């Protein structure tokens, strides 16, 4: 695959399109929002910290012909997800791009507002509920795209279905295992969402991406990053390229993309990324979907597209 440059993307002119980017106040999310705004999209930066969000809006507003704004969203609270979706639906009739980018990585033990393990609750359940609550706006767009930002850490991930209802305690919590589980969940969610879009015959599609090893504040809890980043890490702008490819290329639907270099850690371009067998398990994807609907109390409504009437 040749090196990818957003300027040559299939969907390079985003004038009139609406995009939501979660976690857009810094790192990969900020670079993704910057690139989409520069191409004419109206970008909604969905962020937890209002001041950081305002600063990010000010940083990119001068090169955002379609406009950019911030709206509050805390993915660790399903009530916040519901409030964000309601506010968005009040103002926008359609959503063209939903970039599920925000996340937490190997933090100290914590729980979401509803009592889920923090990484699974934020990285997967929060985005699952957000996508479900915005689904009708996605289906109202001519050809919407949902992009879930995953990680090479999914390779070590396993979904422990037996314990999803009973989060770990501070004593039993394993941060790295929990992160891997949440990133595997991102890929299984993408797999099942794309399957359901296809089965319904709708124009919306889903794709996934990962940034390789990129230097962002997501690594604040990784002490090894202090040593590794100067040697191996790429910039947030470079790390955002797979996300932009997944969002803007027509053929990316259903795919998973990452850097094209050594071990997918970094690269000058974008290439299809490797998925483990667990990340391609259709039955596990459907099972996770069912569990996620039950845990969040939010259900998707993807009505089948009606065939045109016979002449």
Segments from the language model and where they lie:
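SDR active-site lid
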Residues: 196-276
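Residue-level signal for the nucleotide or nucleotide-sugar donor/cofactor binding architecture
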Residues: 48, 76, 233-237, 241, ...
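Active-site rim elements
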Residues: 173-180, 228-232, 274-281
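Phosphate/oxyanion-binding loops and surfaces in catalytic or ligand/nucleic-acid-binding neighborhoods
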Residues: 149, 249, 295
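Rossmann-fold NAD(P)H-dependent dehydrogenase/reductase core
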Residues: 1-220, 298-307
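C-terminal tail/cap regions
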Residues: 2, 252-311
């Amino acid at each position: 695959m040749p090196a990818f440059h957003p300027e040559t993307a299939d969907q390079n002119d985003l004038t009139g399109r609406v995009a939501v980017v979660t976690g857009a106040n810094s790192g990969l999310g900020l670079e993704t929002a910057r690139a989409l705004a520069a191409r004419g999209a109206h970008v909604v930066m969905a962020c937890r910290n209002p001041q950081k969000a305002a600063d990010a809006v000010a940083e990119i507003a001068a090169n955002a012909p379609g406009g950019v704004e911030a709206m509050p969203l805390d993915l660790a609270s399903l009530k916040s997800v519901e409030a964000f979706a309601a506010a968005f639906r009040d103002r926008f009739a359609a959503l063209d791009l939903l970039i599920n980018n925000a996340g937490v990585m190997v933090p100290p033990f914590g729980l979401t507002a509803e009592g889920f393990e923090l990484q699974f609750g934020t990285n997967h359940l929060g985005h699952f509920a957000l996508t479900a609550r915005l689904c009708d706006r996605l289906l109202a767009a001519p050809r919407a795209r949902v992009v879930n930002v995953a990680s090479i850490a999914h390779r070590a991930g396993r979904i422990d279905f037996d314990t999803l209802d009973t989060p770990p305690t501070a004593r039993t919590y394993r941060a790295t295992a929990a992160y891997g589980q949440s990133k595997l969940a991102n890929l299984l969610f993408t797999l099942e969402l794309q399957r359901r879009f296809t089965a319904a015959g709708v124009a919306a599609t889903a794709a996934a991406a990962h940034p390789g090893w990129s230097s962002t504040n997501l690594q604040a809890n990784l002490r090894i990053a202090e040593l590794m980043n100067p040697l191996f890490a790429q910039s947030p702008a470079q790390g955002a390229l797979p996300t932009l490819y997944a969002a803007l290329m027509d053929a990316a639907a259903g795919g998973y993309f990452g850097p094209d270099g050594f071990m997918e850690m970094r690269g000058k371009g974008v290439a299809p990324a490797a998925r483990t067998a667990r990340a391609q398990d259709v039955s596990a994807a459907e099972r996770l979907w069912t569990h996620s609907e039950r845990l969040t109390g939010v259900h998707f409504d993807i009505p089948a597209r009606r065939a045109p009437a016979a002449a």
